[in-house]
């Protein structure tokens, strides 16, 4: 540690409180050994060679660190650790912190603090966890209730849809009745028109016959003619009246037939719309069925969760039984200890306190067992009620499913009946145009023939395509084989090339050896020539200097003879070398011949292999050519087939065109006949009009006008009624669409909520596992400590007081470390609870806001205030969109500021405190280790 950690307390009065705590005065952290105050000083520190020092008696029996001093230092009660007492109110200012409130553990430590406080805190924590678990179970129950309400609302919506379907069925029945009435009226009107046409034809025939009779009579008897003329005029007037009435009836019938045909068309359109609506309702019902199945799956999941809770409750029962067994064991141990204490009267106050603590612990465990038993009974009752509710819901769902199935069957039956009625009506309307139907049948037959031909063409095409594909595959296989053979051929060529290359290299090496030998021979020949030149030069010199150098000549002759001998030797050597070269060349030639023979054999083998491969390739090529020929033949056959099919198609198309021309000609002839009849009818009507213009009265016209006006009013009323029904259907459609959207949104929200709940459950299970592991570790540690206590009590020696002080100091250190750890866990737990509460609150806000936007009524158990539905409060939890950062205006709350010295100083201070805490933690661990080793050494056991 440096000097920064030795700051006095007075210099930090005006500084703010941080989560790490306030700085305290540093304890003595010198690395020198702690000398016991009772140790006798050594007089012979410098004399190492002298004998061992005489043992002297200590002033006190205790040779350890004073246990009361151990816990009076700052490391045990530092302000950085969370305080145990929660009832002290926080100070408003950090500078005026009361010193008595900084350390609230010292007073408890000076008193006789019971040894089982960590276990108590652990039990309190378990109780809190159980409470939280119970709260979450209630929340899950509420969510289940909401799911059930949503399911009930879906079922009610389904019932509404079923009622709408019933009303639509009733309307369809009424429309069917109206349709049948209109069809019957139409048939009666057609019969009346046919009767009237027959009457007209009979009257025309009578007129023609009477005209012939009048023309054939003689003009002699004028009186008879006049009478006959009068009679004829009367008959004509009667006939004209009849014609007029018939004409009016025909016009009325035509108008009625047009109106009824329009009504029929409109009602057919309405029927189609109703059928579409029925299909939509069926699809909606299927969607609702899927939703119901999804909710059934959710209910099954909930039942599985309930079963898991049952299993957990059984596990808790087992744990309770284990705790009961532990409590019995502790009671037995207590009784044994009490008997021992009664035997050994001299017992310390500390052990009595321990006994009291054990008794208190046993009482608390028994209370916990009783509370847990009551909780288990209550939970079992709740589970039974939930299971009963689940069975009721499942029975209701099954009933609703059966009802829906029966209603769907009824709808299907009605739909089939409607379709049958529509088919019958269409068949009745189609039966009037027999010629057109016959022609259409012919066209259909031709189309069927065309279709059959196309089918056969497509089948033959598919067969040929398959054959072509198979042959293509064979060609590909053969091509692959060709490629493999070519690769083998290329490999063989490569090997041949490599061998040729090696042969060339060997030849080049032999040529190099030849050149080196020739160079040696040439060098020897040059030396010989040089010697000969020298001899010639010497001979020339001797001729010039015979007289002066006779002695030299003799010497030179001797030298020449020596040189001759050397030359002979060199020539002999050259000959020997030539012989060797010849022998070597013979050997090399033999080797070469052998190599050449081997290579020739290899080349012959390779050529044979190549020939075989070429034969295979040629055979493969022939097979490929054959397949290609077959392929071309098939292609030509296919082209011929296609040509034939095209010709057939053209013939059929020509036939179709001819049949269409026949149809057109028939229709034209029918139109011409109809126009001729119309012309005749118009001529007759014009004649009748001319005859009856004088006799027509205004009253008849007024009556006709009034009748037509009434009919128009009735048609307008029917039109308005139809428009109103159309608007009703549109409204109902919009309602169905909105309900579908709402259900889809609710489904998405429920999925999101279920995912969030699963995440929270996973977190809770992790926290629970951690707490359970900590509890088990603490229980094991407590058991080990109790075993050690029992062992230490059995071994009572002269140094029992010293050992007891060591044990007390060790357990006090252990206790305070556990207190600090528990306080840290409390802080973490509070933080996690706050985070969970905020998360759940946020989820509730989102769900409430969604329900508010969908206009869904709130349930009765709404625990949130109305302030949380405010948009301002809702935006509080979202990221704020900060404005632009201007250089001039930096005083706003959302603009960047410069870092103040205060924040930096607080950060540095927190780092220093964390360093100090880490140092104190290490020193405490060292103390614990030293004390544990001392206790084990004193008890006679050494753990290596």
UniProtKB/Swiss-Prot annotation:
Residues 23-110 are annotated as: Disordered. The modification Phosphothreonine is found at residues 18, 64, 68. Its main location: nucleus. It is found in: Nucleus; Cytoplasm, Cytoskeleton, Microtubule organizing center, Spindle pole body. Residues 164-791 form a coiled coil. GO terms for cellular component: central plaque of spindle pole body; cytoplasm; cytoskeleton; inner plaque of spindle pole body; nucleus. Residues 96-110 have a biased composition (Basic and acidic residues). Residues 900-927 are annotated as: Calmodulin-binding. Keywords: Coiled coil, Cytoplasm, Cytoskeleton, Nucleus, Phosphoprotein. Gene3D superfamilies: 1.10.287.1490, 6.10.310.10. One of its GO terms (molecular function) is protein-containing complex binding. GO terms for biological process: gamma-tubulin complex localization to nuclear side of mitotic spindle pole body; karyogamy involved in conjugation with cellular fusion; mitotic spindle elongation; positive regulation of microtubule nucleation; protein localization to mitotic spindle pole body; protein-containing complex assembly; regulation of microtubule nucleation. A motif (Nuclear localization signal) lies at residues 54-59, 726-731, 742-747. It comes from the Eukaryota. The modification Phosphoserine is found at residues 60, 80, 529. Residues 28-46, 67-78 have a biased composition (Polar residues). Present with 279 molecules/cell in log phase SD medium. Belongs to the SPC110 family. Component of the spindle pole body (SPB) required for the proper execution of spindle pole body (SPB) duplication. Potential role in cross-linking filaments or anchoring other molecules. It is essential for growth. Homodimer. Component of the SPC110 complex containing at least CMD1, SPC29 and SCP110. Interacts with SPC97 and SPC98. This is Spindle pole body component 110.
């Amino acid at each position: 540690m440096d000097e920064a950690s030795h700051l006095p307390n007075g210099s930090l009065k005006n500084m703010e409180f941080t989560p790490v705590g306030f700085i305290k005065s540093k304890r003595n952290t010198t690395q020198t050994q702690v000398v016991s105050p009772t140790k006798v000083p050594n007089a012979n520190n410098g004399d190492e060679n002298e004998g061992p020092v005489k043992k002297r008696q200590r002033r006190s029996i205790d040779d350890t660190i004073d246990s009361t001093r151990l816990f009076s230092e700052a490391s045990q009660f530092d302000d950085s650790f969370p305080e145990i007492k929660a009832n002290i109110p926080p100070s408003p200012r950090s500078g005026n912190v009361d010193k008595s409130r900084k350390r609230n553990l010292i007073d408890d430590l000076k008193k006789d603090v019971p040894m089982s406080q960590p276990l108590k805190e652990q039990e309190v924590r378990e109780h809190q966890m159980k409470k939280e678990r119970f709260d979450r179970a209630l929340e899950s129950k509420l969510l289940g209730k909401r799911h059930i309400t949503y399911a009930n609302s879906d079922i009610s919506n389904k019932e509404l849809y079923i009622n709408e379907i019933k009303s639509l069925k009733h309307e369809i029945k009424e429309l069917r009745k109206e349709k049948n009435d209109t069809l019957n009226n139409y048939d009666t009107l057609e019969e009346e028109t046919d009767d009237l046409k027959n009457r007209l034809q009979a009257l025309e025939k009578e007129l023609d016959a009477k005209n012939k009779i009048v023309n054939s009579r003689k003009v002699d008897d004028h009186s008879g003619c006049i009478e006959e003329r009068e009679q004829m005029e009367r008959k004509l007037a009667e006939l004209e009246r009849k014609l007029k009435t018939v004409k009016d009836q025909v016009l009325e019938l035509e108008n009625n037939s047009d109106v009824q045909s329009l009504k029929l068309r409109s009602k057919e359109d309405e029927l189609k719309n109703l059928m579409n609506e029925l299909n939509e309702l069926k699809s909606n019902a299927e969607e609702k069925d899927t939703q119901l199945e999804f909710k059934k799956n959710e209910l099954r999941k909930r039942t599985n969760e309930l079963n898991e809770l049952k299993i957990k409750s059984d596990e808790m029962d087992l744990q309770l039984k284990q705790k009961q067994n532990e409590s019995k064991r502790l009671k037995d141990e207590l009784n044994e200890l009490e008997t021992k204490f009664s035997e050994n009267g001299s017992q310390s106050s500390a052990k009595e306190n321990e006994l009291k603590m054990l008794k208190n612990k046993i009482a608390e465990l028994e209370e916990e067992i009783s509370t847990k038993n009551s909780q288990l009974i209550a939970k079992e009752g709740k589970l039974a009620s939930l299971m009963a509710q689940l069975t009721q819901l499942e029975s209701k769902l099954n009933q609703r499913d059966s009802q829906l199935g029966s209603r769907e069957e009824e709808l299907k039956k009605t739909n089939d009946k409607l379709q049958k009625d529509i088919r019958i009506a269409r068949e009745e309307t189609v039966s009037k145009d027999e010629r057109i139907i016959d022609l259409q049948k012919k066209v259909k037959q031709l189309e069927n023939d065309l279709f059959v031909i196309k089918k056969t063409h497509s089948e033959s095409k598919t067969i040929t395509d398959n054959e072509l594909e198979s042959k293509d595959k064979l060609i590909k296989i053969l091509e692959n084989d060709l490629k493999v053979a070519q690769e083998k051929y290329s490999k063989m060529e490569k090997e041949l090339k490599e061998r040729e290359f090696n042969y060339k290299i060997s030849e080049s090496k032999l040529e190099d050896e030849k050149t080196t030998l020739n160079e040696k021979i040439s060098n020897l020949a040059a030396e010989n020539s040089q010697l000969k030149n020298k001899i010639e030069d010497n001979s020339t010199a001797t001729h010039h200097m015979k007289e002066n150098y006779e002695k030299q000549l003799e010497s030179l002759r001797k030298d020449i003879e020596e040189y001759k001998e050397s030359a002979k030797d060199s020539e002999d050597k050259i000959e020997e070398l030539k012989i060797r070269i010849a022998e070597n060349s013979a050997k090399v030639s033999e080797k070469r011949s052998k190599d050449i023979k081997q290579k020739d054999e290899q080349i012959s083998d390779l050529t044979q292999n190549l020939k075989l491969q070429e034969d295979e390739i040629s055979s493969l090529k022939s097979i490929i050519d054959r397949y290609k020929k077959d392929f071309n033949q098939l292609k030509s056959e296919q082209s011929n087939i296609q040509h034939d099919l095209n010709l057939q198609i053209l013939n059929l198309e020509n036939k179709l065109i001819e049949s269409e021309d026949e149809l057109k000609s028939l229709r034209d002839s029918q139109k011409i006949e109809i126009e001729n009849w119309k012309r005749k009818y118009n001529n007759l009507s014009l004649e009748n009009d001319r005859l009856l213009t004088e006799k027509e009265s205004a009253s008849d016209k007024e009556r006709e006008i009034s009748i037509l006006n009434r009919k128009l009013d009735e048609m307008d009323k029917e039109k308005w009624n139809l428009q109103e029904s159309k608007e009703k259907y549109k409204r109902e459609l919009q309602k169905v669409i909105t309900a579908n959207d709402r259900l889809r949104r609710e489904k998405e929200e429920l999925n999101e909520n279920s995912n969030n709940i699963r995440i929270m459950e996973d977190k809770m299970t992790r926290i629970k596992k951690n707490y359970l592991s900590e509890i088990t570790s603490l229980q094991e540690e407590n058991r080990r400590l109790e075993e050690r206590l029992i062992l230490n009590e059995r071994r009572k020696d002269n140094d029992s007081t010293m050992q007891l002080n060591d044990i007390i100091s060790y357990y006090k250190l252990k206790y305070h470390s556990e207190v600090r750890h528990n306080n840290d866990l409390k802080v973490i737990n509070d933080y996690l609870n706050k985070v969970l509460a905020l998360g759940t609150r946020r989820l509730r806000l989102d769900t409430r806001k969604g329900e508010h936007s969908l206009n869904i009524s709130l349930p009765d158990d709404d625990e949130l205030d109305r302030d949380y539905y405010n948009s301002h409060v809702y935006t509080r939890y979202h990221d704020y969109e900060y404005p632009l950062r201007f250089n001039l205006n930096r005083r706003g709350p959302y603009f960047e500021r410069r870092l103040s010295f205060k924040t930096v100083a607080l950060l540095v201070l927190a780092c220093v405190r964390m360093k100090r805490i880490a140092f104190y933690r290490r020193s405490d661990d060292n103390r614990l280790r030293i004390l544990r080793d001392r206790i084990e050494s004193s008890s006679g056991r050494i753990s290596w």
